[in-house]
């Protein structure tokens, strides 16, 4: 058995397979249009986008792939192969939202927010595929962006990057009930291959920092813990509220910690906060500093420094922000002891999903084998579920022809 799972790429072979499945389930004979929407991870910038902080982001070679055709009316239909392996189907029109949260909520909400943004007359018949759903890679942002891109295409609506980010945010905030910021959407919308994006979440803009020459000798690896996540059932919203409470104690006019004036962010004032709120503020302000240092390290090709900042970030997420799950904390601790791992941190909110590692390219196979041996030794029930994959860089969400 290999230590690194088969790598995924949006190759023509993968697309052809999904197109064939889409035609079979819909009964259509014509070729569909296709949206490829990659997933993302953030090596630095955890839990601070909703606090006005900048974020370092990178798209990764896991995907939402949406095959679609214009429908015959304003109604849309959607088919999905869910985790249990069974096909599910639904049909809906604009504003047809169900009271209960369902697998198709994000598609229904995407139709609704786009109709609020611009005049729409055309629905789609679509089939959606996801390579790693609910693994802390922002598959939700990825699939929402895919829906919006397809719906805009069939209605001849031009969406700029900022439009995609804002409409996707509305789906997450207004319909999924998450109080998250926009780093997930921005990470994908502004994604660029062979680079890291420095995201300014307040300005909704990005600066791309090209991979340094030193990355020729390094790789990003990702390890799926075997335990999926769902932010709507996590402590995500509570943490956002705690950060807001800390901000208002530091500066009454602040809605989040990023709005607290710099002169009021000193050690003494933060230390005077209630312990829990002080730790939340320490994480946010420390992570803001690490993002700046990380951007400089990436530009300078200082891989060791960048990796150490990832370690510090993950440590703060665990101890100051208190977001790590049992399995991800175990992976983090194991990875820190493996030679050739420059740094690691878990992805997403840390409530389940994946760990990302920056590693020595020549030691990739050995690192993967050692990590899995130790991890499965602790959690034998996850054998055959947990896996290590190469995390190659990807670009932005895009429309392609089959």
Predicted segments with their positions:
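Gly/Ser-rich oxyanion-binding loop with an adjacent helix/lid
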Residues: 1-33, 42-54, 89, 99-215, ...
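FabD-like malonyl-/acyl-CoA
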Residues: 141-144, 354-358
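Glycine-rich phosphate-binding loop
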Residues: 351
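Short, flexible active-site loop motifs that bind/organize anionic cofactors or intermediates
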Residues: 134, 154, 296, 318, ...
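C-terminal nucleotide
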Residues: 1-40, 44, 69-102, 195-343, ...
């Amino acid at each position: 058995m290999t230590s690194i799972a088969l790598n995924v790429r949006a190759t023509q072979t993968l697309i052809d397979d999904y197109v064939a499945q889409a035609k079979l389930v819909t009964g259509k004979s014509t070729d569909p249009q296709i949206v490829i929407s990659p997933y993302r991870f953030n090596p630095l910038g955890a839990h601070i986008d909703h606090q006005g902080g900048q974020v370092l982001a990178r798209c990764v070679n896991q995907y939402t792939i949406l095959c679609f055709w214009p429908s015959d009316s304003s109604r849309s239909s959607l088919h999905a192969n869910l985790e249990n392996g069974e096909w599910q189907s639904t049909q809906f029109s604009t504003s047809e939202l169900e009271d209960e949260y369902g697998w198709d909520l994000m598609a229904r909400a995407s139709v609704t927010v786009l109709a609020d943004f611009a005049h729409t007359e055309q629905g789609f018949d679509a089939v959606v595929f996801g390579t790693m759903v609910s693994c802390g890679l922002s598959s939700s942002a990825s699939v929402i962006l895919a829906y919006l891109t397809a719906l805009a295409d069939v209605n001849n609506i031009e969406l700029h990057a900022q439009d995609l980010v804002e409409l996707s945010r509305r789906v997450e905030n207004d319909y999924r009930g998450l109080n998250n910021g926009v780093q997930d959407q921005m990470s994908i919308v502004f994604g660029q291959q062979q680079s890291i994006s420095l995201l300014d979440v307040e300005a909704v803009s990005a600066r791309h920092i090209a991979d340094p020459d030193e990355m020729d000798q390094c790789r990003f690896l990702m390890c799926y813990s075997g335990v999926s996540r769902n932010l709507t059932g996590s402590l995500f919203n509570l943490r956002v509220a705690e950060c807001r409470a800390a901000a208002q104690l530091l500066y009454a006019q602040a809605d989040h910690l990023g709005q607290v004036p710099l002169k009021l962010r000193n050690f003494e004032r933060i230390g005077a906060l209630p312990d829990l709120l002080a730790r939340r503020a320490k994480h946010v302000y420390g992570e803001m500093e690490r993002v700046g240092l990380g951007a400089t390290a990436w530009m300078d090709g200082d891989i060791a420094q960048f990796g150490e900042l990832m370690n510090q970030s993950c440590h703060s997420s665990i101890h100051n922000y208190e977001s790590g799950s049992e399995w991800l904390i175990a992976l983090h601790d194991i990875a820190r002891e493996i030679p050739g791992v420059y740094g690691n941190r878990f992805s997403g909110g840390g409530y389940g999903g994946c760990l990302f590692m920056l590693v020595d390219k020549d030691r990739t196979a050995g690192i993967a084998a050692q990590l899995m041996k130790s991890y499965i030794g602790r959690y034998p029930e996850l054998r055959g579920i947990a896996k290590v994959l190469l995390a190659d860089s990807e670009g932005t969400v895009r429309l392609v022809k089959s």
